[in-house]
Regions:
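Rossmann-fold NAD(P)-binding glycine/threonine-rich loop
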Residues: 76-98, 109, 114-117
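Hydrophobic beta-strand scaffold residues
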Residues: 30, 72-73, 97-100
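Short, ordered loop/turn segments at secondary-structure junctions
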Residues: 35, 77-79, 103-105, 130-133
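C-terminal substrate-binding/catalytic lobe of Rossmann-fold NAD(P)-dependent oxidoreductases
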Residues: 4-43, 56, 123-248
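Rossmann-fold NAD(P) dinucleotide-binding segment
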Residues: 48, 56-75, 86
Length: 248
């Protein structure tokens, strides 16, 4: 039986990549592509909703899917732990699945997990992320997820040291981690998680140079997983065994 997919935001750059991958997946078919002017009722009849819309629209997409008893895969940025908490009770009450993937790149997920693994051993951490000038939101969903994972890993050690955070130039605080966002031409996506301690520092860098090639393997994993998921799952690192299990 073919799984019918409603793709929201399918005309954007990520949406087009997802569409191309689904077209190559056995047992899946994109039945409808929704844009910014579409009525969300067009997801009716789908077996799975894939959201590649905008941070502002994404929460309505998730709610519309859950209210209809349809599982949803979210690739849109802007989903912090606080925002996910707003829809978690709805998902659990409906008995559906909502899978949030801040970044479909396996390398990016591994970089975030490595940063979390290193976090207990360094008292200071900051994140620098750079994206192309067309990316609307900042900090990126990947940076937010990385910061949240790093702080969660330091439960026994307490928060990171982050001096002078009252100054705007010190970046935006995400879970107590300063995050610095760059938006400029000539770059697709790059993140540096910089951990520091007395006499040393560790920098974990991930650089995307081809979005379609980098995201395709993660999309191929996430789409079938989301179809069968129950409850809320956050992060590609929870779909594969990379030896480091993160929190949803």
């Amino acid at each position: 039986m073919t799984t019918q997919v409603a793709l929201v935001g399918g005309t954007g750059s990520l949406g087009r990549i997802i569409h191309g991958v689904i077209d190559q997946l056995d047992g899946f078919e994109v039945r409808s592509v929704l844009g910014s002017a579409s009525d969300l009722a067009e997801i009716d009849g789908a077996d799975l909703v894939v959201d590649a819309s905008t941070p502002a629209a994404s929460i309505d997409v998730v709610r519309a899917a859950v209210e209809r008893g349809i599982n949803v895969l979210v690739g849109t940025s802007g989903w912090s732990q606080e925002r996910i908490a707003l829809v978690r009770p709805l998902v659990e009450s409906a008995g559906t699945g909502a899978v949030f993937i801040p970044n479909f790149s396996l390398g990016s997920a591994l970089g975030s997990a490595l940063a979390a693994a290193a976090a207990p051993f360094f008292p200071s951490a900051e994140i620098v992320e750079a994206h192309h000038e067309r990316k609307i939101d900042s900090p990126s969903g990947t940076a937010v997820r990385t910061a949240e994972l790093m702080v969660a890993a330091r439960e026994a050690q307490g928060p990171f040291q982050a001096p002078h955070v009252d100054q705007r130039a010190r970046g935006q605080q995400v879970a107590g981690v300063p995050v610095h966002s760059l938006r400029r031409p000539g770059v697709i996506a790059k993140q540096e998680a910089i951990l520091s301690g007395p006499g040393e520092s560790l920098t974990i860098v991930h650089d995307t140079v081809d979005s379609a090639a980098a995201y395709a393997p993660g999309i191929r994993l996430a789409v079938p997983f989301a179809r069968d998921a129950r409850g809320v799952v956050v992060g590609l690192e929870n779909l594969v065994d990379i030896g480091i299990r993160a929190r949803s």
